[in-house]
């Protein structure tokens, strides 16, 4: 041969060497094994060989992966020949064994060996830095790992071996001294876990890792259909998409995905419910093929094994059931009740103890969670908004139930109690969108009484979670000294030294779950004879009774003893402190949308009953229904009124009463006491009549008249007693069992509207149809001394008179359903119940009477109309006489003087001069964090940034290592009351997760948005909450999932209920979103009264949320106010509310001084002279409304 090559001539063919190959597999404990396979062997065969060596039976959770030629981790296709696959794609024939399919709960893993390998995998994920965790979590995990790997600390003479053991993630670069300090902390953590078995420590380690961000996720860089670079990820719940800065934009659940395919370099996600396809682009075709194949494999696995694929309109919380005992842990753990005696229909086999868990859950496991409620609940069963935690995991499901019942708390804010109590009710997230907020509807007595008539369930088969459903055990009654006031405020004025005192320090302390669930905060015994909270609900109010031996029962105590204990009686009477139901159905806007919001927490506790709570309902309805028979009018002789009068007779009496009252306007009206009488009333003479006070508020305890207790008499008679100068309405009656049965059929319907222009009513004023303000209440002076008993108007008479025009605010679909139900009901069932819903013909007749009397009134008679309206609405004012009154009269500035001063400034142009003299920002302001280059894109307008000393600081994250958000703390003290706001810009598309992080960390419950999403064709604020009616009505922003529960449009503003869930901890919170939508693109709103109604809605919701949080937090959380840049309209809202507070409480009104003070906390507050002038217009309108009171 010319080249000197030698050919072998043995002619032997090595068959064995051609048909077999050896591959190496690195295990999770870093050991490497070799496996001899044939060239035709698949990856599945190799995996089974590895599992045989590890004694694994549950191999379907694991897989094999390799490093590609581009050093990317790639999973082996188990069904294809392994050698061919590795030769084509792998960098070297080295495989890695690992967990391919993560699970949301380690309890799914049945085998001990499986759990051990799973533990090795999650520990490897932590140590390699694939999961983000804080130093505290690193120490805790390291301590558990040492306990799992080495056992108890006392087996070693010292902890020196820890220096050679890998304890911390690879990316945790630290100095030697800091590393030594961390090692010592790990040694202490290891010592604290002494006595825990290694297997238990492994499970505890896994449980801790499951809460970390990024657990079980694989992420691939792709581009969306718009060409934006995003991360396409996959985990056990589905497929998610987030942008490069980390904000999670959307999650596609496994049940929503039809298929995953690829077309060249594009990946297509075909959705089932929507006729659309999500499209993503990769770098090359092979990448797209691999990702689509991987996603298809995961999709098939999780759907076949029914993991995170339950039917739900929103991603459910991950519920974990620990399979080990935590009794040896040194840290306090949330109290978890074991699943005992759970009986459920075969539709669902999972029991949720979450208060919002009314949707079917997983079909294969029984999970229990104690703190996944919409509102915070205590360990002893008391919840902060006046309810008792419904612990469904213990005896709370009967065999007849086919769905998970909700707690009496309005956790699902959009589902009324009447629907939940129906046996055929199927929860639907999508159909709950038209329901009004939880603080507006009233208890459905018809349903409650109907169930009560069917009889009580046996004690052993009842749900014990609601047996201690008593008003005394709610949070409202845990603090009986608190008063809830309506607008205008009537509370005592606090002494003050400085008009606007600035809070210098801004401490940001996060509320830990242990703080939120501290049972000591709610274990407040109720003393006999303590003051009660006043009831103010839309239907006849829940009357109080004398407190007799009240005892504080907790849910945990009741569950422990399995005893039925009836609730204690209601506390002793107290005057109402809110004006109930002055809001008619809205057409354009309602000024003061919900006056009865402030005490709605009391109503919520009797709103959504289970069958075993009927004794409470029975006791309440006995008191509620008494005034229904107490209708009288002045001018007729004493007669007997049968309690089973028809509707027409009672309505004629009502109209007669009103007509006689109108005719007697020339007679001065005496005082009406607002306190209910404890015993038989005795009429004495000497009603001294006093004139009306000046146009300013007297600080009294009540603006509404409460119910009157009936006597114990068996007589069904009503005696008419007339005072010389006053139309008297009195009653001394008891009703029979027949009437109670009739009351049980009362349909709790809101009254229909007038067929003409709708009236809009505020807490402070009623407006005529023409738009001119009408007085809503008049104040009569009441004597403290004197033996005479007071006169009172019952609530039934108020409802009869006001029923046509003054009803609860409901949504239009609800009104339609009410009308349909009216048509279906037979005429013979109309007595008494129709008091709550007058028919159209009666409404027309009453309108005619009102119009005729209105035309007759002239001169001095017209001036007395405010007093008449107050009387017809059952309103009176008890002004306490004495030295205190003299002091207030001497110091109070009449409303007319303040009104003239404000108008004079507007007319003389002094407002412009004031505004020009106020500096735009603080002279020596520091903006060090805001001006950092990495934070420049986080501000909408780079010239508008927060001061360093009072900026809102977020907990730093990997994406936001400075914790920056363009938001400022605004703290003002006026008259001894501290006001705390957070003024911020509207979130940008890439800062929505920062916004929700701020809301969560600052404990915010109310968000006031003073802009539309788009104005004049320009985007004013990115939408940072999900639209109602969209798929799932929920969206995920970083670590937070936001779900829209309801939306109520009130003309110039919209009220939205949101549920915010922290994905890592599973905790949830209710957030009210109030959006003002009538601000024009240029200028200011023309409808000043509408803007006032928006401010009143903010006040109402604030009072509601603060009352819910009483006892949990020492200070009320701030309100987030934002517009586009967070300075112009935001400043208008804050300044207007503060100045209105000054007017209400007779504080000195200095608008320019307050604005200067606000600008020292956030620059450019109120950007234009038009906005500054608008604040004055709001104050003028407020005073004009107040003049009529």
Swiss-Prot record:
Cellular localization per UniProt: Cytoplasm; Cytoplasm, Cytoskeleton; Nucleus
Tissue-specificity statement: Thymus; in cells of both hematopoietic and non-hematopoietic origins.
Feature: compositional bias, Polar residues: 760-771
GO molecular function: protein tyrosine phosphatase activity; receptor tyrosine kinase binding; transcription coregulator activity
UniProt entry keywords in alphabetical sequence: Cytoplasm, Cytoskeleton, Hydrolase, Nucleus, Phosphoprotein, Protein phosphatase, Transcription, Transcription regulation, Ubl conjugation
Enzyme Commission numbers on file: 3.1.3.48
Residue ranges annotated for the FERM domain, each copy included: 21-306
Pfam assignment, any one: FERM_M
Protein's GO biological process: lymphangiogenesis; negative regulation of cell population proliferation; regulation of protein export from nucleus
Knockout mutant characteristics: PTPN14 deficient mice have swelling of the limbs or periorbital edema. These mice also show hyperplasia of lymphatic capillaries of the ears. There is no evidence of choanal atresia or any overtly dysmorphic features.
Enzymatic reactions: O-phospho-L-tyrosyl-[protein] + H2O = L-tyrosyl-[protein] + phosphate
SUPFAM superfamilies assigned to the protein according to its UniProt record, in alphabetical order: (Phosphotyrosine protein) phosphatases II, PH domain-like, Second domain of FERM, Ubiquitin-like
Residues covered by region (Disordered): 744-775
Catalytic residues (UniProt): 1123
Primary subcellular site in the record, as a coarse category: cytoplasm
Phosphoserine: residues carrying this PTM: 314, 461, 486, 591, 593-594, 646, 833
Amino acids binding substrate: 1123-1129, 1167
Superkingdom in the source lineage: Eukaryota
Protein modification: Ubiquitinated by the ECS (Elongin BC-CUL2/5-SOCS-box protein)/LRR1 E3 ligase complex and subsequently targeted to proteasomal degradation.
InterPro entries: Band_41_domain, FERM/acyl-CoA-bd_prot_sf, FERM_2, FERM_central, FERM_CS, FERM_domain, FERM_N, FERM_PH-like_C
GO CC field: cytoplasm; cytoskeleton; nucleoplasm; nucleus
Family to which the UniProt record says this protein belongs: Belongs to the protein-tyrosine phosphatase family. Non-receptor class subfamily.
PANTHER family in the cross-refs: TYROSINE-PROTEIN PHOSPHATASE, TYROSINE-PROTEIN PHOSPHATASE NON-RECEPTOR TYPE 14
Role noted for this protein: Protein tyrosine phosphatase which may play a role in the regulation of lymphangiogenesis, cell-cell adhesion, cell-matrix adhesion, cell migration, cell growth and also regulates TGF-beta gene expression, thereby modulating epithelial-mesenchymal transition. Mediates beta-catenin dephosphorylation at adhesion junctions. Acts as a negative regulator of the oncogenic property of YAP, a downstream target of the hippo pathway, in a cell density-dependent manner. May function as a tumor suppressor.
Subunit structure: Interacts with FLT4; the interaction is enhanced by stimulation with VEGFC. Interacts (via PPxY motifs) with YAP1 (via WW domains); this interaction leads to the cytoplasmic sequestration of YAP1 and inhibits its transcriptional coactivator activity.
Protein name, per record: Tyrosine-protein phosphatase non-receptor type 14
Gene transcribed to yield this protein: Ptpn14
